[in-house]
């Protein structure tokens, strides 16, 4: 019996798990108030019942491990990789075995489960994606490339975002649901918010980073000067993990945009040899209604992490841009934590193309249309030289005309070579279609949110 027939067999035995309904119990309500039946956002309380009904749940661990390993190796790409996800949906035993067999994208370079969207990309390669823009609906959809052709629109849906213009800022709601893109949906995983000029952005994540305590303390400090009230909506965890700054073009000179990203959830040591990204999520668990109502009741009496993004004053941005690790951690014993700085990404230095008479970047065939939105980000050096800011390389941007990559201007060590590696590149290939390639230490969610900043209107950067 082939492994594919085994997968089909246990699928027929179980049926579709999504058709089951589960009841949500909300504490603090009387018996006449019953929770509504919801799908994937509820807890699977009847997992033992499913396991008893399955004839595959009692497989010996050695046999189950062999089946999972062979299936994971055979179905390495989408759409056939959905069989691996189906195996993880069988029961707790199969789910735990899949988690043990399927490695993170950092080591296998594959996106398998939804949590992979918030885990770092591969160290030894890139994950190629593309973004489709719908101007009429103000939506953006991220897909995983299933082909090497840049104009091939066949892809695996990953994330979606919807733009909402406010009086003083712009919001981009990011969701795993392609249709219901809102903060109330079960697929909501974060958002992007810009200031009025479109020069400063903050990326918010629903998953707490490793330094969530420090980020929350900074948010509470900045909110003391804000008089705006808490929105009476069901709150959702919101942690400011990234700040993106675009340099103002006061003189109005023609050229590409200059940007800098402060990754507050990623330490600068992550790109060094042997470095890691701490606090990687192992699963995406939606918040229960019980927790939401409890935190909504307490948010009116004290500052909460669920309402960070009401103030967009300059002092607030300076707090995030200056010190990412200040505050309560200074009271702790570990001095190493205080010395850890956030990873900073900047534009890669381009080279001058004599024939085109412009500054160019080598996108290796992944970008074909010249656009001010195109960019490549690399890790900023710990101690940048004084002349680096004066180079036109900070404004690096161009089409894909050249064939040779730019060479380093001076001899570099292994550490400097790590800082020359392109971590994220984004560029235009057709009307309303853009490519996005990312790698370690960024996740798909972080890379997508950074690319969304390039779509926003910038009144003082062009």
Swiss-Prot record:
It comes from the Eukaryota. SUPFAM superfamilies: F-box domain, Tubby C-terminal domain-like. CDD domains: F-box_AtTLP-like. Residues 54-109 form the F-box domain. Transmembrane segments: none annotated. Ubiquitous. Residues 317-338, 383-418 are annotated as: Disordered. Residues 383-417 have a biased composition (Low complexity). Belongs to the TUB family. This is Tubby-like F-box protein 7.
């Amino acid at each position: 019996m082939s492994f594919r027939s085994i997968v089909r067999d246990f699928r027929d035995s179980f049926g579709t798990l999504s058709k089951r309904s589960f009841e949500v119990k909300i504490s603090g309500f009387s018996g006449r108030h019953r929770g509504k039946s919801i799908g994937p956002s509820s807890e699977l309380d009847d997992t033992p019942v499913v396991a008893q009904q399955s004839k595959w749940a009692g497989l010996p661990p050695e046999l189950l491990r062999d089946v999972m390993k062979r299936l994971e190796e055979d179905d390495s790409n989408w759409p056939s990789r959905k069989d691996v996800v189906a195996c993880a949906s069988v029961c707790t035993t199969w789910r735990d075995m899949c988690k043990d067999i399927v490695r993170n994208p950092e080591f296998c370079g594959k996106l398998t489960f939804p949590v992979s969207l918030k885990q770092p990309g591969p160290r030894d390669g890139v994950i190629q994606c593309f973004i489709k823009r719908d101007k009429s609906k103000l939506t953006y959809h991220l897909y995983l490339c299933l082909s090497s052709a840049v104009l091939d629109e066949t892809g695996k849906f990953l994330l979606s975002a919807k733009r909402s213009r406010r009086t003083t800022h712009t919001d981009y709601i990011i969701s795993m649901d392609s249709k219901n893109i809102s903060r109330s949906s079960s697929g909501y995983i974060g958002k992007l918010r810009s200031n009025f000029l479109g020069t400063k952005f903050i990326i918010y994540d629903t998953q707490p980073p490793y330094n969530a305590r420090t980020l929350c303390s900074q948010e509470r400090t900045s909110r003391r000067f804000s008089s705006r009230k808490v929105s009476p909506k069901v709150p959702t965890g919101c942690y400011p993990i990234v700040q993106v700054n675009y340099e103002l073009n006061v003189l109005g000179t023609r050229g590409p945009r200059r940007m800098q990203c402060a990754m507050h959830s990623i330490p600068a040591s992550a790109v060094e040899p042997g470095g890691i990204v701490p606090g990687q999520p192992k699963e995406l668990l939606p918040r229960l209604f019980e927790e939401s109502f409890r935190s909504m009741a307490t948010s009116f009496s004290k500052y909460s992490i669920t309402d960070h993004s009401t103030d967009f004053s300059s002092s607030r941005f300076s707090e995030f841009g200056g010190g990412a690790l200040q505050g309560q951690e200074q009271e702790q014993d570990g001095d190493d934590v205080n010395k850890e700085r956030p990873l900073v990404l900047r534009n890669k230095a381009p080279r001058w193309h004599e024939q085109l008479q412009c500054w160019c970047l080598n996108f290796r065939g992944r970008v074909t249309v010249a656009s001010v939105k195109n960019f490549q980000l690399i890790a900023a050096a710990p101690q940048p030289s004084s002349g680096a800011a004066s180079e036109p390389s900070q404004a690096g941007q161009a089409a894909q005309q050249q064939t040779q990559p730019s060479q380093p201007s001076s001899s570099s060590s292994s550490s400097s070579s790590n800082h020359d590696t392109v971590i994220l590149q984004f560029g235009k290939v057709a009307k309303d279609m853009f490519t996005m390639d990312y790698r370690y230490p960024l996740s798909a969610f972080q890379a997508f949110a950074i690319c969304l900043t390039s779509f926003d209107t910038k009144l003082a950067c062009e």
